[in-house]
Amino acid sequence: MIEPHAPAPPGSPPSWGGPCGPEAPARLPVRPAVGRFLVLAGVFVCAACGLVYELELVALASYLIGDSVTQASVVLSVMVFAMGLGSLAAKRLRGLAAAGFGALEAALALVGGSSAMLLYAVFAWTGGWGGLWADGPRILLVAFSLAIGVLIGAEVPLLMELIQRVRRQDPGGAVADLFAADYVGALVGGLAFPFVLLPFLGQLTGALLTGTVNAVVGAALVLGLFRRDLTRRARWLLLTANAVVLALLATATVLADDFERAARHAVYGQDVRVAVRTGVQEVVLTGDADGRPLDLFLDGRLRVRGSDERSYHEALVHPAMGGPHARVLILGGGDGLAAREVLRHPGVRRVDVLEADPGLARLARHDPGLSTLNEHAYGDARVRVLSGDAFHRLRATPSATYDVVISDLPDPGVTASTKLYSQEFYGLLRRVLAPDGRLAVHAGPVDARPRAFWTVDATLRAAGLPAVAYRVGARDTGPGPGSVPGPRRAAAGPPAPRGWGFLLAARTAPAPRLDPAAPRPHSLTPDSLARGVREAARTQMAGLPPSTLVHPRF
């Protein structure tokens, strides 16, 4: 596939190609040194835009489809492969390097800039079709990765041709200069995406703005610096193409907010009552009107379902409160619902809620629907909200600080939460627990994903916290609180769990029981708890290795 090239005879002039003749240098409106600088500046900007396109696809795919490690691997590997194809294809354009580069950048700006909006549209309006289109969003993700990769890969050979036409240079030095500008541009794009574009503009507008910058710089470089090498027809074609691309991107930018609202209604239904982006995630509340129960979605995944959240939170909290419980730590639980159940027990003096997203805790405190559901738990003086990384917080926490720890975290299968189900993390929890303290862990649906559930059990035991498993059934087959199978309209995802699985751990294997001094739970009884222990035991898988930071098992 890669064609061999014979070395040029000593003293022979370079083969420039291009419309001005095979050996003619570019006719520039500026001095060669300035022209060379402008080409390298264009390389810098195009590299930054290219990396933003890659990161935007990874981020959006992780949000829409889930499993960020898999999505990053798919996008990056497909894109790098496509870049190789683009480099080979660009050899046919070397004779028309200026016109080819101008057309290439216009196409890349349109495809890359619109990719986030088109991918989100397919997910929102066709994600529930199933059948032959069950993997539609995944197919489109691969298609965009291929297209963007081919276009990015074709840039370098054409830019190499252009920079050599500006001023002849030793090929090794030209490649070094070109790659230096390319890599520095990629650094700037890689830092701009998470720290500027994503928090201030969002994924859709950020991608559209990147496409606009890409189109403007590409057109300016070709139509400004190399315009004398273009025919009149080529100049008008490039000018028209870039004007159309910029008009499309500008129109999409103006309509981005309306599009996002329409897509959100397509995903969640028409009863969206709150939709906010915190500094960490998108939080959506639906229902709580005309008798419809309130549902809470975090980054598109159902986290709380008002119709049966009480069954989940009672099963998570009450068995752990069967012993000393004056000092309680809740991991996650920013919605305040686990804190609500903790505060029902007499003798509780302190409740620390360690939530990675303080914006969610603020919403749970101030939103009328959610604060009513959590019975205004954050208004209790005993409750304190802590934010930040759980690892860092626990490392700085003195030993034996808490009598009870409640782990109200997403399923271990969600990549971002995997480290919070590791042996190292449970070792930190063991240290902060009092000698007779208890740890309750939501470990995912034991029926649907037994291997992941019992891996959590093996990890707890490896950390010196033997556990007793129990399950509680949901009232229907849909995903409920604490389960994170993926966005509601995900085209393909794990099966919806029929119940929730929990592990109650301590330094010595505890006996799950309810606190007789506490108010009676609404749905959990001693008999149902004992039955849940027996049902979970029937699914036990022995001999599983623990999950660690360097070797996650989920």
Curated annotation (Swiss-Prot):
Compartmental location: Cell membrane
Bias type Low complexity, positions: 485-495
Domain PABS: 247-492
Pfam families: Spermine_synth (PF01564)
Residue stretches spanning the membrane: 37-57, 69-89, 106-126, 139-159, 184-204, 206-226
Chain sites annotated for binding spermidine: 313, 335
Residues given in the record as S-methyl-5'-thioadenosine binding sites: 281, 355, 389-390
Keyword Signal listed: no
Primary enzyme class: transferase
Stretches the record annotates as Disordered: 1-20, 476-495
Coiled coil: none
GO biological process: polyamine biosynthetic process; spermidine biosynthetic process
GO molecular function, one term: thermospermine synthase activity
SUPFAM superfamilies cross-referenced by the UniProt entry: MFS general substrate transporter, S-adenosyl-L-methionine-dependent methyltransferases
Record's keyword terms, sorted: Cell membrane, Membrane, Polyamine biosynthesis, Spermidine biosynthesis, Transferase, Transmembrane, Transmembrane helix
Active site: 408 (proton acceptor)
Skewed-composition ranges (Pro residues): 1-13
UniProt region (Spermidine synthase), positions on chain: 235-516
Membrane topology: Multi-pass membrane protein
Enzyme Commission number: 2.5.1.16
Function, in words: Catalyzes the irreversible transfer of a propylamine group from the amino donor S-adenosylmethioninamine (decarboxy-AdoMet) to putrescine (1,4-diaminobutane) to yield spermidine.
Oligomeric and partner information: Homodimer or homotetramer.
Protein name: Polyamine aminopropyltransferase 2
Species name: Streptomyces coelicolor (strain ATCC BAA-471 / A3(2) / M145)
